[in-house]
Regions:
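Bacterial Sec-dependent N-terminal signal peptides
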Residues: 1-26, 252-255
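Sec-dependent signal peptide cleavage junction
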Residues: 17-54
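Short loop/turn motifs that connect adjacent beta-strands in outer-membrane beta-barrel proteins
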Residues: 40-53, 89-96, 157-165, 180
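Surface-exposed strand-loop-strand hairpins of Gram-negative outer-membrane beta-barrel proteins
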Residues: 62-83, 202, 235
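Extracellular/periplasm-exposed beta-strand and loop segments of Gram-negative cell-envelope proteins
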Residues: 68-75, 110-120, 125-143, 176-188, ...
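Predominantly the C-terminal beta-signal and adjacent terminal strand-loop region
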Residues: 198-255
Length: 255
């Protein structure tokens, strides 16, 4: 009996030692922590070599919307514009930029055996067909404007806009600098030359002194198509035909 008790006590003692050794070798379980995914870095653009379309040259076809049937035009009416602009890329998205500048815009409309009395002492502008009497072989109306264009631009590759598609919408506000008619080569009703000379008459009396023109450009690199439509009338209300000039053409940009 004593032997049984001694054997049992020995077994319990050994088990106790083994349990203590096992507990001391166990490592605490650390709670798993899921690391947050790193935030995607915003792409940085290098604009140090970016051309900003500071200088714009435009040539285009000019016309009059709402032109009366009694006004006969001919030839290739045209516009010439030149602007210097400052370009400011958006820090939040360099694809976009805003541009503002100044320049000069000119329109030249050619007429077929017509007379515009812009200098006549009349209450309204005289516009008449002179094909059945003496007239000028070549006759045109030219206007020149000092303008301030503003554009919102988008470039598909802001680091290399000279090799990228681009879009621009904007508006330009202009003040009239000069308006004149120019006639060349005086003829009779049979279109026979009577005398070769040039007559130029200048007056701004019948013209609106301010014009507002929404604009649009789209193209690639340094060449873009442009369109412009004057929402203000060319002549003062009630003093001349209710025409609104428009232009479609090409823009060459640089710097």
């Amino acid at each position: 009996m004593k032997k049984v008790i001694l054997v049992a006590a020995a077994v319990l003692f050994v088990c106790s030692l083994y349990a203590q050794q096992t507990d001391s070798t166990l490592k605490p379980v650390q709670p798993s922590v899921t690391e947050a995914a790193p935030k995607k870095k915003k792409k940085q653009f290098d604009l140090s070599n970016r051309s900003n379309d500071h200088f714009l040259l435009q040539i285009g076809y000019a016309g009059w919307n709402n032109q009366p049937d009694t006004i006969n035009t001919k030839g290739l009416p045209r516009s010439f514009n030149a602007y210097f602009m400052l370009d400011f890329p958006f820090k939040s998205n360099p694809h976009f930029s805003a541009a503002i500048g100044a320049g000069v815009g000119t329109d030249h409309i050619f007429f077929n055996k017509m007379y515009l009395g812009i200098k006549d002492p009349t209450t309204t502008l005289t516009v008449k067909d002179v094909s059945d009497t003496t007239h000028f072989k070549k006759y045109k109306l030219a206007t020149a404007w000092l303008e301030a264009p503003i554009e919102l631009r988008y470039s598909f590759d802001p680091e290399n806009p000279g090799k990228s598609w681009k879009i621009a919408i904007g508006v330009k506000v202009g003040t009239l600098l000069n308006a004149h008619t120019k006639g060349k080569t005086w003829q009779n009703s049979q279109n026979q030359t009577l005398i070769s000379y040039i007559q130029k008459e200048s007056s701004k009396r019948f013209f609106n002194s301010t014009r507002i023109v929404p604009t649009f450009r789209f193209g690639y690199g340094h060449v873009t198509l442009f369109g412009a439509y004057q929402i203000t009338t060319l002549f003062k209300e009630g003093l001349g035909p209710d025409v609104r000039p428009y232009t479609i053409g090409l823009t060459l940009s640089g710097l």
